[in-house]
């Protein structure tokens, strides 16, 4: 449900404070209005509840507390919502250049935000888990390595996401390890890019063209909107005509045909992750505990049920990293469930670049 959190407005229509740095303004008066949950509950009662359907709402500006109101089954509203909080960790807060004001990626911020949502919705709601969609760029280009360790990186981020409680969303091409594109600015179709260029670069001159280009290459929505890459033939096998948008320059390297021909491809790793989630109740029902919150390279957490405990570990860096901080979780019951380096047998060995695994430890 597109921007569903904006369907209720304060009927006194209060003004925002006047600003000189932008022509348009969105904020607290646009979302989570006074009758929002009344309307959603009514929609559920009168329409949604009459069908065997799953509902997810796009809810920018929502906190975990608001998400609980949306997704608590007893409230009969929605099944889950898309949060944007983790998508904003690499932007400078309050900048007039908005999403184009890049802030260096800090894994600790990602862990903090995602863990807060895991813990605050546990047994009270449900998470929609995602790194990519039609409004977000490719995660391995944005926060990882899309060259030397492209496949390892894609599998590592997939492992982190699929080990959490909630419903993982896999956006087209994510299961192939597709990457961002780097086109000249005048070739981008996204109206957000075109408007921001005129507003920030041309008119207000708050960001240089070079810095804006780098930001577009990093975060433009068009990164995820190129035609899907089916094979290495003309137009990537997408069409015999002329596609509406330029193809990624890497379609001959990254495509469905190649993924299906390679036994250890990103595609098959995603299939294994999805099968694991269907087979293992712990991944659905177990609680969540973040480990090593201040580690700048390792994303690791526990999933625990009454019957067993798993550890999920991902080195989200290009370095070899020690697992010394996880020594207390070494167990004689270690059982690897999935790993993107096939020779991983336990916790003790150092983590190689973008190495990730899920392991039962009791």
Which residues fall in each region the model found?
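Active-site and adjacent substrate-binding regions of carbohydrate-active enzymes
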Residues: 1-362
């Amino acid at each position: 449900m597109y921007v569903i959190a904006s369907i209720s407005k304060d009927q006194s229509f209060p003004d925002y404070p006047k600003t000189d740095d932008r022509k348009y303004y969105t904020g607290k008066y646009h979302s989570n209005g006074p009758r929002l949950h009344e309307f959603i509950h009514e929609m559920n009662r009168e329409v949604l509840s009459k069908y065997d359907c799953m509902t997810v709402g796009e809810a920018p500006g929502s906190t975990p507390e608001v998400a609980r109101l949306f997704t608590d089954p007893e409230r009969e509203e929605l099944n889950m919502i898309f949060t944007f909080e983790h998508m904003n960790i690499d932007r400078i807060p309050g900048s007039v250049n908005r999403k184009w004001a890049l802030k260096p990626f800090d894994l600790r911020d990602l862990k903090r935000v995602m863990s807060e949502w895991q813990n605050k919705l546990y047994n009270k709601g449900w998470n929609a888990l995602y790194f990519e969609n039609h409004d977000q760029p490719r995660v391995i280009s944005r926060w990882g390595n899309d060259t030397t360790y492209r496949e390892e990186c894609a599998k590592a981020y997939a492992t982190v996401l699929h080990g959490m409680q909630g419903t993982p969303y896999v956006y087209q091409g994510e299961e192939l390890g597709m990457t961002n594109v780097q086109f000249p600015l005048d070739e981008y179709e996204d109206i957000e890019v075109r408007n921001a260029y005129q507003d920030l670069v041309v008119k207000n001159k708050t960001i240089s063209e070079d810095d804006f280009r780098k930001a577009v290459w990093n975060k433009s929505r068009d990164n995820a909107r190129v035609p899907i890459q089916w094979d290495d033939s003309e137009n990537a096998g997408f069409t015999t005509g002329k596609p509406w948008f330029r193809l990624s320059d890497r379609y001959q390297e990254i495509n469905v045909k190649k993924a299906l021909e390679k036994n250890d491809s990103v595609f098959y790793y995603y299939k294994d992750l999805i099968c694991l989630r269907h087979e293992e109740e712990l991944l659905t029902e177990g609680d969540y505990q973040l480990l090593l919150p201040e580690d700048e390279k390792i994303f690791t957490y526990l999933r625990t049920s009454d019957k067993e405990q798993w550890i999920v570990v991902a080195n989200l860096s290009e370095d070899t990293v020690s697992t010394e901080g996880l020594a207390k979780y070494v167990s004689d019951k270690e059982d690897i469930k999935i790993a993107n380096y096939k020779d991983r047998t336990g916790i003790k060995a150092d983590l190689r670049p973008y190495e990730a695994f899920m392991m039962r430890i009791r």
